[in-house]
């Protein structure tokens, strides 16, 4: 979540600064992400129920996060349509990971401790939702200022996007650890929830 929700806070400005999108339309491209999630998350959840592969889906989603933020960081194809395509891929990743992550929790944690487990997950997420925007804002102001153009400060988003990509790397490491632990302990993360 730290690679997505805090990113959305800065995404409209990224669209203006890097992709030269009209400021009046800059929120439209990041706005595709929640619209896509509304449609895709239930579909991916249903897919997980039918085929399983929860840890694998989390790995795939994490790789997609790394790819998206790396593409936003690289100085290539600085045009609106590329940003739109990359944002749609981010919507896929953002839908894929939670649709596999949340149903995996009761497979790992005993039922009598589920409340504590979910509370701890939200606690960690909220630290990220509080701290990551502060970190990105500090990085932008300290290391990424460009020239003032028409009275407005410009920013280079390469370093912040690299930081978001590193959160994707962290998510990938956790997903791979879950996959390995599942192999050892047989939690059933790769098994379908709907048994025929």
Question: Where are the regions a protein language model picked out?
Answer:
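A membrane-interface helix-boundary motif in multi-pass transporters
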Residues: 138-168
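C-terminal transmembrane helical hairpin of 12-TM major facilitator-type secondary transporters
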Residues: 54-101
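A late C-terminal transmembrane helix in Major Facilitator Superfamily
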Residues: 111-145
